[in-house]
């Protein structure tokens, strides 16, 4: 068997911030802007 199978290794791919994912922000939290365009 290959080393990956022999050692029971796996891969988890996280696409929560990928283009076209659930939301348009880089991370899960929504960024809010004040009246001057500054992130709050």
From Swiss-Prot:
- Where mainly found? secreted
Q: What class of enzyme is it?
A: hydrolase
Keywords, comma-separated and alphabetical? Carbohydrate metabolism, Cell wall biogenesis/degradation, Glycosidase, Hydrolase, Polysaccharide degradation, Secreted
Q: What is its EC number?
A: 3.2.1.58
Q: Which reaction does it catalyse?
A: Successive hydrolysis of beta-D-glucose units from the non-reducing ends of (1->3)-beta-D-glucans, releasing alpha-glucose
Which GO cellular component terms are attached? extracellular region
Cellular localisation:
Secreted
Q: An example of a Gene Ontology BP annotation on this entry?
A: polysaccharide catabolic process
A GO MF term: glucan exo-1,3-beta-glucosidase activity
The reply to whether Cell wall biogenesis/degradation figures as a keyword in the UniProt entry is yes
Give the family, as the similarity comment puts it.
Belongs to the glycosyl hydrolase 5 (cellulase A) family.
Q: What is this protein called?
A: Glucan 1,3-beta-glucosidase
Source organism of this protein record: Pseudotsuga menziesii (Douglas-fir)
């Amino acid at each position: 068997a290959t080393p990956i199978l022999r050692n029971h290794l796996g891969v988890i791919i996280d696409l929560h911030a990928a283009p076209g994912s659930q939301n348009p922000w880089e991370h899960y939290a929504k960024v809010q802007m004040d009246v001057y365009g500054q992130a709050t």
